Regions:
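Short, low-complexity N-terminal intrinsically disordered segments enriched in polar/charged residues
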Residues: 1-33, 37-41, 138-143
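A beta-strand edge to alpha-helix "cap/lid" segment located at domain peripheries
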Residues: 1-6, 68-143
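A solvent-exposed, acidic/Ser-Thr-rich amphipathic alpha-helical stretch
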Residues: 30-90
Length: 143
């Protein structure tokens, strides 16, 4: 089923919320609240290129684990969205994610691609790709 403009906007607002409410996610209650606002309860998150670690995460507990493993070691994490649109049957976001290792001054940045599957207006699946090209290829394969 094709994604709607509302689905694309939902993902856009989820990125904005992530950037605006980082301090709210410093404890587990904040992480769970962010999940409840934007994600389907049965969301599946897949590190498709085995980056940063080979893993997949399912449901609320999986989201909490994913968040802690991927963002816990960093401060001032933010997403800068370079591209966001419907591609095939998915929403694709090409982003630069940046942050600093806790207690360090050096900022790290990496370009990733995220391919979103939507269900009932919420994020139901996320595939993370290292680099933009792989994400676009994966999304086009769903068309």
């Amino acid at each position: 089923m094709p994604v709607s403009d509302e689905d694309v906007e939902h993902v856009r607002r989820a990125f904005a919320s992530f950037n605006e409410t980082a301090r709210d996610r410093e404890d587990e209650a904040g992480i769970r609240a962010h999940h409840a606002r934007w994600y389907d309860p049965d969301v599946e998150i897949v590190n498709a290129d085995n980056w940063p670690v080979p893993a997949s995460y399912k449901g609320t507990e999986g989201y909490v684990r994913w968040y802690r493993e991927n963002y816990g070691p960093y401060e001032d994490v933010r997403y800068d969205v370079d591209f966001l649109d419907a591609v095939g049957n998915r929403v694709v976001a090409l982003v630069t994610i940046s942050g600093r290792p806790r207690g360090e001054e050096t900022e790290l940045a990496v370009q990733i691609g995220l391919v979103y599957g939507m269900r009932n207006g919420r994020i139901a699946r996320v595939e993370l790709y290292l680099g933009h090209d792989r994400a676009m290829q994966a999304a086009r394969a769903t068309a």
